[in-house]
């Protein structure tokens, strides 16, 4: 077997220019299918995984030498793009489950997923929790065993540069537009000073999902033999 199944990423690798190229967005994601996808498609429907969103995160506005000038600054850089767009909008039906394959391909910045929120008086990320549910199924291209999948309910996630996460995400029953909110971080101590920012929005509208489309798969996809050791 060559590369193991999972969500993987790539970047330009010209020696001497790699950091500059990655900072300028020369990155991408590729998915290798295997038994993991087969199990999800058996539950959600033939070809379902091929219709699910792949979210490639890039940091925007960094300088090629990655320096931040001035003493006493607390910001860790600018916001992020998602598939080359700033704060795009994803559509979901009420109660629908989607598989989000998220890859942080930033040149430097980490990304702390704080949650999914309705708008509040202080801004899009400072309202009430929106009622989304999510369960993690894979990390860095490696699927989780069932015990970890079962224990993973609405986890907060830290994605440093190069990290990938697969999440099954269930939309709330209430229609509306909600913000997926993150904090830009390099070190955990940054979280005390970094404001929440909208990574992208989810518009929940239309006919409510039903059947398997509105359920989490009961058990994680079977763990492959090549990972058993």
Please give the residue ranges for each predicted region.
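Extracytoplasmic/periplasmic ligand-capture domains
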Residues: 1-2, 167
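Short alpha-helical segments and helix-capping/turn motifs at coil-helix boundaries
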Residues: 14-16, 35-42, 85-87, 97, ...
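Histidine- and aromatic-rich segments of cupredoxin/plastocyanin-like copper-binding domains
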Residues: 56-228
């Amino acid at each position: 077997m060559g590369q193991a199944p999972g969500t993987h990423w790539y970047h330009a690798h010209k020696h001497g220019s790699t950091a500059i190229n990655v900072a300028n967005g020369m990155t991408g994601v590729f998915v290798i299918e295997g038994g993991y996808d087969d199990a999800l498609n058996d539950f959600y429907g033939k070809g379902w995984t091929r219709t699910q969103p792949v979210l490639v995160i890039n940091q925007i506005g960094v300088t090629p030498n990655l320096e931040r000038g001035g003493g006493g600054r607390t910001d860790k850089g600018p916001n992020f793009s998602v598939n080359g767009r700033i704060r795009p909008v994803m559509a979901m039906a009420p109660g629908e489950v989607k598989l989000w394959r998220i890859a942080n391909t930033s040149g430097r910045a980490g990304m702390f997923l704080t949650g999914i929120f309705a708008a509040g008086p202080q801004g899009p990320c400072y309202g009430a929790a929106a009622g989304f549910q999510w369960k993690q199924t894979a990390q860095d291209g490696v699927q989780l065993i069932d015990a970890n999948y079962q224990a993973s309910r609405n986890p907060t996630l830290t994605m440093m540069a190069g990290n990938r996460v697969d999440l099954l995400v269930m939309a709330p029953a209430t229609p509306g537009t909600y913000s997926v909110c993150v904090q830009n971080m390099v070190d955990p101590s940054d979280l005390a000073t970094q404001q929440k920012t909208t990574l992208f929005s989810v518009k929940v509208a239309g006919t409510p999902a039903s059947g398997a489309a509105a359920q989490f798969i009961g058990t994680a996809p079977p763990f492959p033999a090549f990972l058993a050791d």
